[in-house]
């Protein structure tokens, strides 16, 4: 059943791509209906009710071309508040459609609906959509395939076939109950029971062999795998036995191609990779494996998800009943930070005439953010399960973000920020310390709903520094509303005197989600040309739940095409 469903998905993808190819060069409006509903799903011999879109897990793939206008009507038939984020879509002048609850919109209440309207401007590649409230994105997510305009090819040889590969994370228990319990006790949440590949855990888990994704390939053909990490809390190593992968795109942005045996992909990130099948039938199958990368000192899901790469047999009748061998790749160690660093160092923008790297050469505003864990004190006479009887927290510049009761963007647009948010997010740590050395004795963080205000058109440089508080850890930071250039990164404390001289301002990789290295720092630059309120947060869901998030408020520009339009009439109310 599961193998058949994987074949059906590939057929649907091919059919959709053929339909898009047959359409003219002019941009069109593409309309989708998302029915958010509860669905019974069985994995690991355990059946539970999950929230899905259109009864599918993972959800449906959205197809569009660069320049198209997209309208997605979301009808909420689930018992939970809901909102959908179109991860990586720039949302130029359409911030009302970005999706994070209480940032750009109030959530869609049960029984309600909302139409997300946006235009895909200057983007092509693999992105994805997901719920952006609580932990509902565990099952409410799906791919977005954005093709170049009709008649425009890829800057690499066209593949024989394109296949979305979506990594996820599965709990036998209700994920809303998992995070609710963690927030009540102040401790860490229960870890997941499995990872998934296109919704299937694969044969390495008990009672799961029937739920295995299988990719059928023809000898000598090249396939483009559209990789998406939709896992909640884990970065993943990925490899296919006895095959190499050529990376051609990350976060829907072309890169200079390079070939690897293993890649790293963090939650929120996407990557297009080319897989060239062996020239002749090998008489074997090959595992596609993914397992976590982590430097955390706490518990985590140390399991491996497997799919199977199978070759079409040119002589299936003579091979009937014959069991072919299956090979497994060797993945890096769980905590192999060097493997991660070596991979990320290879990423460079294509920086060609057709796809230039518009790196801001001059900077108007510089910021320095610490990102990491911390604590809140336990309530008087309370019992908490965090470090030393405290409650786990997380922060940026020691501010643990608290979601407001109404949406920031609505409050800003109406000029009613009082009592909703403050515009004094710190530009740098108020109490500097040796960030990657011995942590301070006081690990408490402050709560706040603070934004950082930017003038329209500002060129921004931001250095994000990991801290050793409660252990050095990699943090995948996602910025809504913008792509950014990763101009530098390193280990230890950022050196503001010497490190900027090493920045790559020629062809740095451009992304929307970047890993702040464990025990290190990363520097990014972006051009603030999109008015609105834009969320920035760790894409490890547990860290975001603990407060590792903030918001940028980009003011309107002077021209009409630099001003955020009024909200749509059907925007949900709190």
UniProtKB/Swiss-Prot annotation:
Give the enzyme's EC designation.
Answer: 1.10.3.2
Q: PROSITE patterns, per this entry?
A: MULTICOPPER_OXIDASE1 (PS00079), MULTICOPPER_OXIDASE2 (PS00080)
Q: Which InterPro entries match?
A: Cu-oxidase-like_N, Cu-oxidase_2nd, Cu-oxidase_C, Cu-oxidase_fam, Cu_oxidase_CS, Cu_oxidase_Cu_BS, Cupredoxin, CuRO_1_LCC
* UniProt entry tagged with the keyword Coiled coil: no
Q: Where does Cu cation 2 bind?
A: 87, 130, 539
SUPFAM superfamilies registered for this protein in UniProt = Cupredoxins
Q: What is its main location?
A: secreted
Q: What region holds the Plastocyanin-like domain?
A: 35-151, 161-314, 424-558
Q: Which GO terms describe its molecular function?
A: copper ion binding; hydroquinone:oxygen oxidoreductase activity; oxidoreductase activity
Under catalytic activity, the entry for this protein gives: 4 hydroquinone + O2 = 4 benzosemiquinone + 2 H2O
Which Pfam families does the protein's record reference? Cu-oxidase, Cu-oxidase_2, Cu-oxidase_3
List positions binding Cu cation 4.
475, 538, 543
Q: Which GO terms describe its cellular component?
A: apoplast
- Annotated signal peptide: 1-27
Q: Which superkingdom?
A: Eukaryota
Q: Where does this polypeptide localize?
A: Secreted, Extracellular space, Apoplast
**Residue numbers binding Cu cation 1:** 85, 478
Q: Where does Cu cation 3 bind?
A: 132, 480, 537
Establish whether keyword rRNA-binding is in the entry: no
Quote the Gene3D superfamilies the UniProt record gives: Cupredoxins - blue copper proteins
PANTHER family tied to this protein = LACCASE-12, MULTI-COPPER OXIDASE
This molecule's function is given as: Lignin degradation and detoxification of lignin-derived products.
What is this protein called in UniProt? Laccase-12
**Taxonomically, what lineage is the organism?**
Eukaryota, Viridiplantae, Streptophyta, Embryophyta, Tracheophyta
């Amino acid at each position: 059943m599961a193998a058949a469903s994987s074949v059906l998905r590939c057929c649907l993808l091919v059919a959709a791509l053929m339909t898009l190819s047959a359409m003219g060069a002019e941009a069109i409006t593409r309309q989708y209906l998302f029915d958010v509903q509860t669905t019974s799903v069985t994995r690991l011999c355990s059946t539970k009710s999950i929230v899905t879109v259109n009864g599918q897990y993972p959800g449906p793939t959205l197809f569009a071309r660069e320049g198209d206008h997209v309208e997605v009507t979301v009808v909420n038939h689930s018992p939970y508040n809901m909102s959908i984020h179109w991860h990586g879509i720039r949302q130029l002048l359409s911030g009302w459609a970005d999706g994070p609850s209480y940032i750009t919109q109030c959530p869609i209440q049960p029984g309600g609906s909302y139409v997300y309207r946006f235009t895909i401007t200057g983007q092509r590649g693999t992105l994805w959509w997901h719920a952006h409230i609580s932990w509902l994105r565990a099952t409410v997510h799906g791919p977005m395939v954005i093709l170049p305009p009709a008649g425009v090819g890829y800057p690499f040889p066209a593949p024989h076939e394109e296949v979305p590969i979506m990594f996820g994370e599965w709990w036998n228990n209700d994920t809303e109950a998992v995070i609710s319990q963690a927030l009540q006790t102040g401790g860490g949440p229960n870890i997941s029971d499995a990872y998934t590949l296109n919704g299937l855990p694969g044969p390495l888990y008990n009672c799961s062999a029937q739920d295995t994704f299988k990719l059928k390939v023809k000898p000598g053909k090249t396939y483009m795998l559209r990789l998406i990490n939709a896992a909640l809390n884990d970065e993943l190593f990925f490899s296919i036995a006895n095959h190499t992968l050529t990376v051609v795109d990350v976060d829907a942005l072309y890169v200079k191609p390079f070939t690897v045996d293993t890649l790293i992909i963090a939650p929120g990130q996407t990557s297009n990779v080319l897989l060239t099948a062996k020239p002749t039938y090998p008489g074997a199958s090959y595992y596609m494996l993914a397992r976590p990368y982590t430097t955390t000192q706490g518990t985590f899901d140390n399991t491996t998800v497997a799919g199977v790469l199978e070759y079409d047999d040119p002589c299936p009748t003579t091979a009937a009943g014959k069991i072919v061998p299956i090979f497994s790749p060797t993945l890096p160690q769980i905590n192999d930070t060097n493997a991660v660093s070596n991979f990320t160092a290879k990423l460079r923008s294509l920086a060609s005439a057709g796809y230039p790297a518009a790196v801001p050469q001059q900077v108007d505003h510089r910021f320095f953010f610490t990102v990491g864990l911390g604590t809140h004190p336990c309530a008087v006479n309370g019992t908490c399960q965090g470090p030393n009887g405290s409650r786990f927290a997380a922060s940026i510049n020691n501010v643990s973000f608290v979601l407001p009761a109404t949406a920031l963007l609505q409050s800003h647009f109406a000029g009613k920020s009082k009592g909703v948010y403050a515009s004094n997010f710190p530009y740098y740590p108020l109490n500097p310390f040796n960030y990657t050395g011995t942590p301070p004795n006081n690990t408490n963080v402050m709560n706040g709903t603070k934004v950082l205000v930017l003038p329209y058109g500002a060129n921004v440089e931001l250095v994000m520094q990991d801290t050793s508080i409660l252990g050095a850890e990699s943090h995948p930071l996602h910025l809504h509303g913008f792509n950014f250039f990763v101009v530098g990164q390193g280990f230890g404390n950022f050196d503001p005197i010497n490190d900027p001289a090493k920045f790559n301002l020629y062809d740095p990789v451009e992304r929307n989600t970047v890993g702040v290295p464990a025990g290190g720092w990363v520097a990014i630059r972006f051009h603030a040309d999109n008015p609105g309120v834009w969320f920035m947060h760790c894409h490890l869901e547990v860290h975001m739940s603990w407060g590792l998030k903030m918001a940028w408020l980009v003011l309107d520009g002077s021209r009409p095409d630099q001003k955020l339009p009024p909200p749509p009439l059907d925007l949900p109310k709190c």
